[in-house]
């Protein structure tokens, strides 16, 4: 059994597709099909076997699971999370990060004072966006780049941004 600390979320089932038990898989890997090169598991650490049927223009994967043959069976998979073992991931280059390692990191200002935490990392197609939850419980979305985040470590990020009063 694997703890969630040893697992990295790499995809989620968005919906059913067609009548043969196919599902729409939103992959968090780049490229999207890279998810299929990993040994995939569920939250309990049990192996998951997925077969690619096709990929749509949005980069979402249309897949099937070995034991799912009908739309009714596939309906229960909506929101199903797919993981891989952290130990199976490749080493990253400098200035590369896994989303799981950045989420919940403290956000510090230029004076190294904690002002919030990274709540989420989003991507709507034009680059990564960092959602920050500030100490006053408000949130803001900022582009994930060196201008806004000049220093990123495994323990915190520095934010170069002045909030409006």
From Swiss-Prot:
Where's it found, cell-wise?
Answer: Cytoplasm
Recorded hits in Pfam families, A to Z, give: PRC, RimM
Q: What is its main location?
A: cytoplasm
Annotated GO MF terms:
ribosome binding
Keyword annotations for this protein, in alphabetical order, are: Chaperone, Cytoplasm, Ribosome biogenesis, rRNA processing
One GO biological process from the UniProt record?
Answer: rRNA processing
The keyword Phosphoprotein appears for this protein: no
- Quaternary organization: Binds ribosomal protein uS19.
Recorded protein name is Ribosome maturation factor RimM
């Amino acid at each position: 059994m694997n703890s969630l600390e040893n697992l990295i979320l790499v995809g989620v089932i968005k919906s059913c597709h067609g009548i043969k038990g196919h599902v729409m898989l939103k992959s968090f890997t780049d490229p999207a099909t890279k998810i299929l090169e990993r040994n995939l598991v569920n939250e309990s650490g049990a192996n998951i076997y997925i077969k690619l049927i096709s990929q749509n223009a949005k980069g979402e994967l249309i897949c099937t699971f070995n034991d799912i043959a009908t739309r009714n069976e596939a309906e229960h998979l909506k929101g199903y999370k797919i993981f891989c073992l952290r130990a199976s991931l490749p080493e990253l280059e400098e200035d590369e990060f896994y989303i799981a390692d950045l989420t919940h990191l403290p956000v510090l200002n230029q004076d190294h004072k904690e002002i919030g935490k990274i709540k989420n990392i989003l991507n709507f197609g034009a680059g990564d966006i960092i959602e920050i939850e500030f100490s006053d419980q408000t949130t803001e979305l900022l582009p994930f780049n060196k201008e806004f985040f000049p220093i990123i470590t495994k323990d915190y990020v520095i934010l170069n941004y002045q909030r409006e009063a």
